[in-house]
Amino acid sequence: MRKLLFEFEDLSWFPDTIRESMTDYLRYFLKVTKFYKPVIPFISEILKQTNHQNIIDLCSGSGGPVEEVLSGLNATSEGNIKVTLTDKFPNISSYTLLQNKYPKSISFESTSIDAKNVPEELKGLRTIFSGIHHFDEVSIGEIIHNAIQNNAPIGIFDGGDRNIFMILGIILFHPLLFFLFTPFFRPFRISRLIFTYLIPIIPFCTVCDGIVSITRLYAPEHLERIARVHDEARYTWKSGKVKNSLGMNVTYLIGSPKR
């Protein structure tokens, strides 16, 4: 079933203007709802355990929850946590906006970065937010294997529950959120207004991708099973679910080199 489904934003030919507007919406939604707030303590713990202050965020989209996560981490950290945003299709305008807002904390890679083959010079805790469901089991194994080969700790986080209520919520509420909040999304784009209100391609594709995303979600034990297949007992793994303020489950898989 997974192989038969696709998400528009994964397609190489999909227009950047539409893709970036979709991920800009996701960043706004994740920030306003504090979607990933419950996993910040996990990230803080693994940073301290591995003595890292750098986060290499993979599959960043438009930045996802980076502002919320960074704020939470720096509130409890003794040092200044730094985040490098990366993506296969980097959203340069959004990354620049975030970098200008947090010049001492956020940087980005302007070239395409494959989560399965991260450059060795990008050192730190690797994170993936709302992205792992885009990959099949083989690709997830390659992502984890690459982290292990580079002795990099990794945290994978994905939100939502695989049920009909989640799908109905996406169908009913996301179009309304687009209608109400699109003028507040940054960076401002005229094209975003056109393809939201006049020709609603952005909301349509976002809702379609959201529905497919729900059907593709992985259970935490599934992710941990994939991880252990690629790990020769070199890493400590922890997986599970925590509820956020919306009452939705956030799945997590965290791995770090054994000390």
Question: Locations of the language-model features?
Answer:
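Class I SAM-dependent methyltransferase Rossmann-like catalytic core
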Residues: 1-57, 62-64
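A conserved beta-strand element that flanks and buttresses the S-adenosyl-L-methionine
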Residues: 126-128
